[in-house]
Amino acid sequence: MWQRHRRTILLILFFGGFLWFAYWFNRLPAPYAAREESPFRPSNTVRDHIPALTDPSFESVVSADQYLTDDGFGIDVAVEGYRRFYPVQVLVWHEAVNDTFRGKPLLVTFCPLCRSGAVYDRRVDGTEMTFGTAEEVWNSNILLYDKKTNSVWSQLDGIARRGASLGKSLAPYPSRWMTWADWKHAYPTGEVLSRNTGFVRDYTLDPYGAYRTNQQVWFLVAKKDDRLATKERVFGVTLGKASAAYPEKAFVTKSILHDVIAGRPVVAWKDEDTGSVSAFARNTAAHVLTFRSEKAGFVDAETESVWTSDGAAIKGPLKGTRLERLTTVPSFWFCWFAAHPDTQLYSR
C-alpha cells in the first residue's frame, strides 16, 4: 500500500515540477541583444499572473534574517521616522506591493527586467488606487494596472501609458536602494516585508536565474544607447522633465558627484554608512553648495554647515535647511535610456 502511495506522490511531484518549469520556460522569450523596436510588447503572461501584494504583513529583522542574504538588495522606505524594508527576494516574485504605511498609501514596485525599484503614492487625483501586474511590458519595463480605471502605468517612472489616465503621473515617494546587511545594521528595530504572503513561493530562489548578470534582454526597446554596457547599473535622477544617469561605478572612487541638470545645480552622494545613493538640488536662496565628505556628515564649502545623507543641515549657519530631494531610481542602463532617451550621462 505504501509503495503505491509513494509512487503516486513521486508522480505528482514530478509533474508539478515539470509544469512549474514549463510555465517559466514559456513565459520568458528567447534572449537577444538589445535592439530598437516598439516600446510595447506582450509579456507572455496574463493579467495578475504575477500576483501583486495587498495589505502585506511584516516581520522583525531577527525573523527575516533567517532567510535573507546579506548581499541581497531591497527598498528602504521611511515614514515619520519609522522604517520598512522590502527585500528583492520577495519583490521579484510579486513586482508590486500595495501598502499603507502609517496611514500613507504607498505602491512599492520592482521590475526584475530592469532591476529597478521605485515607490509611489497610490493616490491619483485624490482617489486611492490598488494596482496589479499587467500582461505587457513597456521598453522592457513592467506595466502595472490600476483596478479603478484599468489604465496601465510604467514601473520605472509611474506614468500612465494607456487608458483613461493616459499621461498622468503617480507622485514619487522617497526610497533608498540598500543591501540587507546595511539595512539591518542601520535599522535593527525596523519592519521587513514578510515572506508569509499567502502564496507558495521559494523566496530564497531568483526565478530569473542569470538574467541580471548577462548582457541579454528578453524584450525589445524603442531606443538604445551604447555609451554604457546594456545592463550596467545606474542611478537615474529626474528633475522636472529632465533626467540624468549616474553609473554605480562612479561612486567607487567618489562618494559625492556634483552636476547640473537642466541648468539646476545638483548633487548625488553615497552614504558610506548605508551604501545608499540619494540626489538633491544643491542650491539654497543664497548659495550654490559644494560638498565634501567628513566623519560628521556632508559639509558644504560655502558655509561649513553639516548635512545628513537625507539632505538636512544639522549644524552650522544653514541648520534647519533641507535640500530639495530628487527622485532617484536604480536601474539597468538600457531600461533607463529607453524610458529617458534625452537623459544626460554623468561621465566625469
Q: What are the residue ranges of the model-derived segments?
A:
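N-terminal secretory signal peptides that target proteins for export/translocation
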Residues: 1-3
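Mid-to-C-terminal functional-domain signal that highlights helix-capping/loop sites
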Residues: 5-348
